[in-house]
């Protein structure tokens, strides 16, 4: 990419040099007598060609350091010319800078007092030589490859502005996430330290130990560790995103020199180093907590060993029991064991004093190893930080060197281009004309193609917009219909509730009858254009619409009275009877006990062999089960005086059932309308 950018800058510098040479040309001199024909013209042409070739070699050697290295290795005297014109080679400068940075890194690392073995340095991969690039001679007769135009300052400014906005947002987000991760890490460290402190207090004070606090502290520490792990992952992801934006900006030639890139990279390095340092602190806290865990394990082991010894001496005594007295033998055995234990502990103490120095040296060795691990981690973190900082300094130095190189190259190309500016002007003018012709033709074709594509897209967008408008219109209609269906469904349920309960404020049967005119008119207002609804509303009985129907419970209560009176007059025919006949029927009803029976839905009724008692019993069962429809069918089979008494009840019950059936049809119609209008 740098080579392509350098070639572009070379071509643009040549153009500017020719323009300046044309503007600053001397005034026309008086005509000179044409020289005589001689061999001087050929010599001048040869000298001009030599100068042009030498200038091309010098320019390409500046652009491609590998080509310069090959030329210097092939022709050693050329090295002095290149050093005088172009300065010292960039490869040598880079090697020298790498050596200086290596010395700086080595000096920056703090040296320990102990003499450590030297680190083995991995050998650098050998630099593979590139294949020599073939330079084709310029031929005016051939088509010149169109040059990629340099982006305008507005485009460069817009891209840099966009990059800066992205970098600011990414830096702010990364800093926020790293701040959250740091706070979570600090909470984890506090939780680990708290767990270690509670564990030490619990182990030291075994009598009043509360291990639930230790468990809860450990759970808090683990929970905080999970939280800070997630926060750390988020923070590093945001840092990687910031570095990705920086790398993308460096790859783009228009934004590669933006000074904010280096600052953003430095910020990313600092944030990453901050996470590494806080991780080192967390590891240190966990290591200190591990020492307390080992101490707790040793205490538990000694207590278990003592419990086993006590159990072997006093197998029948629960040493963990409270408020239990020991007998004399158990106390003697316990005292003897205590004396033996004291003697044993004295011997162990003397041995322990001998081994104490070994244990201390071992503990010091373990602590030294732990300190070395921590120091190694800190050293690796610091080395990575120093390495990233040095890389950043190298990039900053490269940016500064690149700007100085570009200035030197521009001055050298101006001096080199002054000798053959006229010839190159003619060539470039011709190539530019050809390029403009081709470019204008391509632009016209692209504009025409884009215009056709735009027309197609506009047509498709208009068609899509019309479809969306139609869909929205139909959806509005469906919404209105669905809303009306829901209102109709609610009104239908209110109608059923009115049929079932009537006027709840009524004190007697007649006052609880509520006319249905108001509810039916409300249904007509909700669906004024529905013929099915109007037909069902017109089918309601007039008595139900004007006076109202009895409620279901009132009809059941009336049937209870009808059942009692019907059994008393079951033996009376339609023409009535004497007082003795009524008395006999009453006495007969007293001696005939209605045994509860279960009648099935498929049981047939023999009309000729069924009396009024069985009919009333069947009707009572159906009424109690809430099946008024079958109750009416059975009650219609009554004969004599009970049939006359049941006539009004049958009419009122039939009116109630008809109204309820019509209301249920309206509810079903409302449910279907609601489902149909749901999209």
From Swiss-Prot:
One of its GO terms (biological process) is cristae formation. The chain crosses the membrane at residues 43-63. Expressed in the gonads and muscle cells. Disruption phenotype: Egg-laying defects, defective oogenesis in 30% of mutants, reduced brood size and increased resistance to oxidative stress inducer paraquat. Abnormal mitochondrial morphology with mitochondria appearing larger and as localized swellings and tubular extensions. Mitochondria also have elongated and curved cristae that are stacked with a reduced number of junctions. Residues 1-42 are annotated as: Disordered. Keywords: Cytoplasm, Membrane, Mitochondrion, Mitochondrion inner membrane, Transit peptide, Transmembrane, Transmembrane helix. Residues 64-679 are mitochondrial intermembrane. Residues 1-17 form a transit peptide. Sustains mitochondrial morphology probably through maintaining cristae morphology. May act as a component of the MICOS complex, a large protein complex of the mitochondria. This is MICOS complex subunit MIC60-1. It comes from Caenorhabditis elegans. The gene is immt-1.
């Amino acid at each position: 990419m740098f080579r392509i950018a350098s070639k572009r800058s070379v071509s643009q510098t040549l153009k500017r040099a020719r323009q300046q040479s044309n503007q600053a040309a001397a005034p026309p001199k008086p005509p000179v007598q044409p020289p005589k024909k001689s061999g001087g013209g050929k010599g001048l042409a040869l000298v001009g060609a030599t100068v042009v070739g030498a200038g091309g070699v010098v320019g390409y050697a500046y652009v491609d350091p590998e080509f310069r290295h090959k030329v210097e290795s092939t022709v050693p005297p050329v090295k002095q010319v290149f050093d005088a014109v172009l300065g010292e080679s960039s490869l040598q400068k880079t090697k020298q800078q790498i050596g200086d940075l290596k010395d700086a890194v080595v000096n920056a690392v703090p040296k320990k007092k102990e003499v450590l073995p030297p680190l083995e340095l991995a050998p650098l991969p050998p630099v593979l030589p590139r294949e020599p690039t073939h330079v084709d001679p310029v031929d005016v007769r051939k088509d010149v490859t169109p040059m990629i135009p340099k982006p305008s300052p507005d485009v460069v400014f817009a891209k840099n502005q966009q990059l800066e906005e992205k970098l600011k947002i990414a830096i702010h987000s990364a800093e926020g996430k790293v701040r959250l991760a740091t706070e979570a890490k600090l909470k984890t460290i506090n939780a680990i330290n708290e767990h270690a402190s509670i564990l030490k207090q619990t182990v030291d004070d075994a009598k009043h130990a509360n291990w639930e606090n230790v468990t809860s502290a450990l759970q808090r520490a683990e929970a905080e560790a999970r939280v800070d792990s997630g926060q750390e992952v988020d923070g590093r992801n945001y840092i990687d995103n910031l570095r990705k934006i920086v790398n993308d900006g460096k790859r783009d030639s228009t934004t590669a020199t933006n000074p904010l890139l280096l600052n953003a990279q430095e910020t990313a390095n600092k944030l990453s180093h901050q996470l590494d340092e806080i991780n080192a602190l967390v590891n240190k806290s966990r290591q200190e907590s591990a020492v307390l865990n080992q101490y707790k394990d040793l205490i538990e082991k000694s207590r278990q060993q003592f419990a086993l010894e006590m159990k072997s001496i006093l197998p029948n005594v629960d040493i963990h029991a409270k408020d239990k007295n020991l007998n004399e033998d158990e106390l003697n055995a316990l005292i003897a064991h205590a004396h033996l234990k004291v003697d044993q502990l004295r011997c162990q103490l003397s041995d322990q004093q001998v081994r104490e120095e070994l244990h201390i040296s071992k503990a010091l060795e373990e602590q030294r190893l732990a300190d070395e691990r921590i120091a190694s981690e800190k050293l690796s973190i610091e080395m990575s930080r120093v390495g990233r900082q040095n890389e950043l300094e190298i990039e900053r130095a490269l940016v500064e060197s690149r700007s100085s190189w570009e200035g030197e190259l521009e001055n050298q190309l101006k001096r080199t281009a002054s000798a053959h500016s006229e010839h190159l002007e003619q060539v470039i003018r011709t190539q530019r004309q050809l390029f403009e012709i081709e470019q204008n033709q391509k632009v016209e074709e692209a504009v025409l193609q884009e215009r056709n594509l735009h027309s197609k897209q506009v047509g498709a967008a208009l068609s899509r917009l019309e479809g969306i408008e139609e869909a929205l219109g139909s959806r509005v209609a469906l919404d209105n219909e669905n809303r009306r269906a829901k209102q109709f469904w609610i009104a239908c349920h209110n109608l059923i509730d009115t049929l079932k309960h009537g006027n709840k404020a009524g004190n007697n049967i007649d006052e609880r009858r509520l006319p249905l005119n108001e509810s039916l008119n409300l249904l007509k207002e909700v669906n004024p254009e529905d013929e099915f609804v109007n037909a069902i509303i017109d089918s309601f009985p007039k008595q139900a619409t004007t006076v109202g129907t009895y409620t279901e419970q009132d009809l059941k209560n009336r049937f209870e009275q009808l059942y009692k009176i019907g059994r008393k007059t079951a033996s009376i025919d339609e023409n009535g009877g004497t007082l003795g006949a009524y008395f006999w029927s009453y006495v007969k009803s007293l001696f005939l006990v209605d045994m509860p029976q279960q009648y099935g839905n498929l049981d047939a009724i023999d009309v000729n062999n069924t009396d009024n008692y069985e009919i009333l019993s069947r009707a009572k069962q159906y009424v109690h089960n809430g099946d008024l429809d079958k109750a009416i069918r059975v009650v219609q089979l009554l004969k004599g005086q009970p049939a006359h008494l049941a006539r009004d009840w049958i009419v009122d019950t039939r009116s109630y059932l008809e109204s309820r059936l019509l209301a249920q049809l309206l509810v079903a119609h409302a449910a279907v309308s609601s489902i149909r209008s749901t999209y």
